[in-house]
From Swiss-Prot:
<dbReference type="InterPro" id="IPR006103">
    <property type="entry name" value="Glyco_hydro_2_cat"/>
</dbReference>
<dbReference type="InterPro" id="IPR036156">
    <property type="entry name" value="Beta-gal/glucu_dom_sf"/>
</dbReference>
<feature type="glycosylation site" description="N-linked (GlcNAc...) asparagine">
    <location>
        <position position="736"/>
    </location>
</feature>
<dbReference type="InterPro" id="IPR050887">
    <property type="entry name" value="Beta-mannosidase_GH2"/>
</dbReference>
<dbReference type="GO" id="GO:0004567">
    <property type="term" value="F:beta-mannosidase activity"/>
</dbReference>
<feature type="disulfide bond">
    <location>
        <begin position="764"/>
        <end position="769"/>
    </location>
</feature>
<feature type="glycosylation site" description="N-linked (GlcNAc...) asparagine">
    <location>
        <position position="803"/>
    </location>
</feature>
<comment type="subunit">
    <text>Monomer.</text>
</comment>
<feature type="disulfide bond">
    <location>
        <begin position="167"/>
        <end position="176"/>
    </location>
</feature>
<feature type="glycosylation site" description="N-linked (GlcNAc...) asparagine">
    <location>
        <position position="302"/>
    </location>
</feature>
<feature type="glycosylation site" description="N-linked (GlcNAc...) asparagine">
    <location>
        <position position="226"/>
    </location>
</feature>
<keyword id="KW-0458">Lysosome</keyword>
<dbReference type="Pfam" id="PF17753">
    <property type="entry name" value="Ig_mannosidase"/>
</dbReference>
<dbReference type="GO" id="GO:0009313">
    <property type="term" value="P:oligosaccharide catabolic process"/>
</dbReference>
<dbReference type="GO" id="GO:0006516">
    <property type="term" value="P:glycoprotein catabolic process"/>
</dbReference>
<feature type="glycosylation site" description="N-linked (GlcNAc...) asparagine">
    <location>
        <position position="89"/>
    </location>
</feature>
<dbReference type="GO" id="GO:0005615">
    <property type="term" value="C:extracellular space"/>
</dbReference>
Length: 879
């Protein structure tokens, strides 16, 4: 706990200096359970589980079966308490407030044994007037109630009709009635995560004292005025006025780099607390706009806002302001029924390339700045430009959005409602209104957020009737849906933020959904809006099973994390694919079988006698399968951006499910818990490259498309090669040296019947050869070599067990792995166990005899440590 001038990291790591003191209560507290049998120190911000683990009272909650073993923690009622002395003279201040930025979730707050308020929503801040109860020495208690028990009680109180789903599927081993509490919906379990319905003070808590007035919030929105062809900034500030009299003053906004300074007179009263300003940017000053990654710079300008009020009060806020426009284009497409669905940033159509973000941990106090920055570096390194913040988790911390702004990562922001129906009692709706207002005001100044989405999959849940509600009752549920997402959430968003689009759900049909009364007849329509698509039964190498939709905001396949990640939370008896641990960790129904089903279509399952080797090989094959499946699907979406075929196409976004993991378990993630890259993430780095050749077959003809995110046409050379599996030396090459890849398009550059291709390369059959192809570009432009399999690899002939030798050397902070192979090696996987870092490439088809790969460590390591931990695997090693 410490005293400081008020410094709030509310927007863009901005600072706000106030004449009154701000005293942080973060730091060391005490926490005790319901019957008082446990009492221990606890850190705030933090969680009960974290405190128990830190003091050795429980193991790692993620170890083996501890999600079940420690269920008692979430069922108990815990109390956080602290005592503190006010380090300033209370008599000098008219008003004193106790402010919580986040309480998780249901608690009664006692200040000096006086109840000053209650909390029931994890997603909003709370402010309490303690002027009349604060003393020089004070006690503060938060008496938490079990979120599980609270949700059950709220559900039981809703007696008029059921609000499904009552409980999660049994595979998830979770708790019931999560839709009755405003808390991270995945905290009660999900099909990729555990049930840890935690309790704690998860964000900052502080005391603020002031005279005259206090700045409660401040937002700013740059808006481009088409009529005047100039930028304006809409600024809105809200004050708590302590004085009974009106308070006059001035506000000055300055942006030195844009030669902008504007001063306005203002007047505040207790009933008139809002200040609205329109700051006009000079037309003769060039404004550099903010661009998504890969399309330009993320230029921002330092802005100061100074409120000089009567009585000598000065409140200054410094922030970074970014200028950009966003449009969601829904209009007719020639040759296709329906409407387009794509985004324009600063007037330029942008293909969304990225993934879906889930909470990085069940316990947010573990998501440190370093950990967050490491995850974002992996996003950037994989050539992504978009993250969808999924609606079953949390509105992310301020640093998350600041990083998105700085790095050019667009954000598709869901509101936190997912895969469920929700009650619409007055109390629930009032809490949601506070939540939505709070979050929109907190986040709307971030240029990275390009769209608000009301929920995850709740429109389709009603349209398809996921929860088997009686058709006679469907109107009640539809009315509840419209009440919550349209009449409340949408109404608030449109009132608070007109700068970006809002859709009621994802997936949705956009404008078509509105026309159909907000529940579309077919939310999965590929002619409108966005879709979510999953298919675990059909062959994922067959691109024809995938929908040629306008934008695909979810799609994916599962895999297992690496053995080095699992080893930390398991014991030797767990190391088998069908062990009790493996079955327990799989929360998706039939998930383990579905992975093997896909693997068996194209690969041979391990047949070894060593159980541990078999387990490791199976893990490897699930990662190969996942990477190859999502490569095939993503490349289909990428090459569909510029074409309409049979009325389908104009795909302008591919966000695979999912980016990150919440714990160590099989999931759809490309990044394991702890940040290690799965094979899929290396594939994503390649298939999201700014210039990519994409190959596929249709009716016996082999095609190569050129897919470009570049802003200019690119003149290059395309080389197509055939290789025999037994030798890295290419059998033949076809070269076209006059290729033009169109800017921002996907176009056919090469086509040839496979039979003709094989004729030109004597000695090749579908089973004995593989195709590679690449653009010849300068070193500054990343354009990877791609490949196409002419048969399933389980049918490949001449595929030898490659002897791959490796020599490791060090150059500065980077390590060089020089590889040499005796034969073409599919899916070469370099692994250094638990040593944190990533390779420049991995999981690749090694078609050259020699290859150098770089390793970038995330922490200091040595050549000897790498040599000891290193292993290399290719496909034939699993036979």
């Amino acid at each position: 706990m410490h005293l400081h001038l008020l410094l709030i990291l509310a927007l863009f790591r901005a600072g706000c200096v106030v004449a009154g003191p701000s005293y942080s209560l973060s730091g060391s507290w005490r926490v005790s359970n319901g019957n008082g049998s446990l009492e221990l120190p606890a850190t705030v911000p933090g969680y009960v589980h974290s405190a128990l683990h830190q003091h050795g009272l429980i193991q790692d909650p993620y170890y083996r079966f501890n999600d079940l073993n420690y269920r008692w923690i979430s069922l108990d009622n815990w109390t956080y308490s602290t005592e503190f002395k006010i380090p300033f003279n209370l008599s000098e201040w008219q008003k004193v407030k106790l402010i919580f930025d986040g309480v998780d979730t249901v608690a009664e707050i006692l200040f000096n044994n006086v109840t000053i308020g209650k909390t029931d929503n994890m997603f909003t801040g709370y402010s309490f007037d303690i002027t009349n109860v604060v003393k020089d020495v004070n006690s503060l208690k938060l008496q938490f109630r079990s979120a599980v028990q609270y949700a059950e009680c709220q559900s039981k109180a809703h007696t008029s009709y059921r609000v499904p789903p009552e409980c999660p599927p049994v595979e998830q081993k979770g708790e019931c009635h999560v839709n009755f509490i405003r808390k991270a919906q995945c905290s009660f379990s999900w099909d990729w995560g555990p049930s840890f319905p935690s309790q704690g003070i998860w964000k900052d808590v502080r005391i603020e004292a002031y005279n005259i007035a206090h700045l409660d919030y401040l937002t700013f929105l740059p808006v481009y005025d088409n009529a005047s062809q100039a930028w304006n900034i809409e600024i809105k500030a809200s004050f708590d006025v302590a004085s009974s009299k009106s308070v006059g003053g001035q506000v000055t906004v300055a942006i030195p780099q844009l030669k902008t300074q504007q001063t306005n007179d203002i007047e505040l009263q207790q009933e008139q607390r809002i200040v609205k300003l329109l700051v006009k940017i000079r037309k003769d000053v060039a404004v550099e706009t903010w661009w998504p990654r890969g399309h330009g710079n993320q230029t921002g300008y330092n802005m100061t806002i100074l409120f000089a009020l009567d009585g000598g009060l000065k409140i200054e806020k410094a922030a970074k302001v970014y200028f950009r426009t966003v449009q969601l284009i829904e209009e007719g497409i020639k040759g296709s029924p329906g409407l387009s669905f794509y985004f324009k940033i600063n007037g330029l159509p942008i293909f969304l390339k990225g993934s879906n973000w889930i909470p990085a941990d069940s316990f947010q106090d573990k998501v440190t700045s370093d950990r967050l920055q490491l995850l974002f570096q992996s996003v950037v390194d994989a050539n992504m430009n978009t993250l969808r913040v999924w609606g079953g988790g949390i509105y992310e911390q301020d640093e998350f959005y600041a990083l998105c702004d700085e790095l050019g990562i667009m954000v598709w922001q869901d509101f936190m409602f997912a895969s469920a129906l929700y009650p619409t009692e007055p109390g629930f709706l009032a809490s949601v209104r506070k939540e939505v207002t709070y979050q929109v005001r907190r986040l709307k100044s971030h240029p990275s957020i390009i769209i608000w989405s009301g929920n995850n999959e709740n429109e389709v849940a009603l349209s398809v009737n996921w929860f088997h509600v009686n058709p006679r009752d469907m109107k009640t549920y539809i009315d509840d849906y419209v009440t919550l997402y349209v009449k409340n959430i949408r109404k608030i968003v449109l009132s608070e933020d007109k700068s970006r689009p809002f859709i009621a759900s994802s997936p949705t049909n956009g404008m078509k959904t509105m026309e159909e009364g907000w529940i579309s007849y077919d939310p999965y329509s590929i002619q409108y809006g966005d879709i979510h698509f999953y298919n675990y039964a059909d062959d994922c190498w067959n691109w024809k099973i995938f929908p040629k939709a306008r934008l695909v905001s979810e799609y994916g396949y599962q895999s297992w994390p690496s053995f080095s990640t699992l080893e930390k939370v398991s014991s030797q008896e767990d190391w088998a694919y069908n062990s009790r641990f493996s079955l327990h960790r799989q929360h998706h129904e039939d998930g383990n079988h579905q992975m093997l089903h896909q693997v068996k279509m194209h690969f041979k399952l391990p047949q070894g006698t060593d159980p541990l080797r078999t387990f490791k090989d199976t893990i490897y094959l699930t990662q190969v399968m996942q990477a190859q499946c999502i490569k095939t699907e993503t490349e289909f979406y990428l090459r569909s951006r510029s074409e309409i075929v049979d009325g389908k196409g104009h795909t302008m976004g591919a966000l695979y499910w999912q980016l990150n993991d919440i714990w160590q378990a099989p999931s759809w993630a490309s990044l394991e818990y702890g940040g290690k890259w799965k094979m899929l993430h290396y594939f994503a780095r390649r298939f999201f490259a700014p210039l990519l050749p994409v190959g596929f077959e249709d009716e016996g003809v082999f095609y190569v498309y050129g897919v470009s995110d570049l802003h200019k046409d690119h003149h290059t050379q395309l080389t197509v090669r055939l290789h025999h599996w037994s030798s890295p030396k290419p059998l033949c090459s076809l070269v076209n040296s006059s290729i033009v890849v169109k800017a921002g398009e996907a176009v056919v550059l090469f086509q040839m019947p496979v039979s003709e291709l094989l004729k030109r390369c004597r000695g090749c059959t579908r089973e004995t050869c593989v195709v590679s192809f690449y653009f010849s570009t300068d070193k500054e432009l990343f354009s990877p070599t791609n490949y196409h399999f002419l048969s399933s690899l389980k049918d490949a002939k001449g595929l030898l067990e490659a002897n791959i030798t490796v020599n490791i050397s060090q150059k500065g902070n980077v390590f060089v792995f020089d590889l040499e192979t005796s034969a073409v090696a599919p899916f070469v996987w370099l692994d250094v166990g638990s040593i944190p870092g990533r390779f420049s490439d991995n999981g690749f088809l090694m078609i050259r005899k020699k290859l150098s790969v770089l390793f970038y460590p995330w922490k200091p390591t040595s050549k000897s440590e790498l040599q000891q931990a290193f292993s290399v695997t290719s496909l034939t090693d699993t036979y």
